[in-house]
């Protein structure tokens, strides 16, 4: 058990918090594999370059990730006071979420299972 006064423990915990601007989308209706195709294309890029890539990328996941990136940019400006010109994508990853199970009727009374996969997508920005 931790020793010390409760307020001191809180202060220490808040001092160790990550202050980089970020945005997280939970339960996105796109599989991790499909989201990672788009995330690999923008990892390490400047924010303006990444927005251009996401705008003209034909994949469905790119529209979701573009909204998430715009949210992370707004967080950086409003919460951290950073300028957009210096921002770049430091981390971006997709973790596996729950799977919705659905049934597809087939011939002669059979049924095939369809798995609609979800993911949790996280973007972390930083200044150069």
Kindly give the residue locations of the regions a language model identified.
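Ribosome large-subunit tunnel/peptidyl-transferase-proximal elements
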Residues: 2-94, 118-128
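Strongly charged
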Residues: 97-128
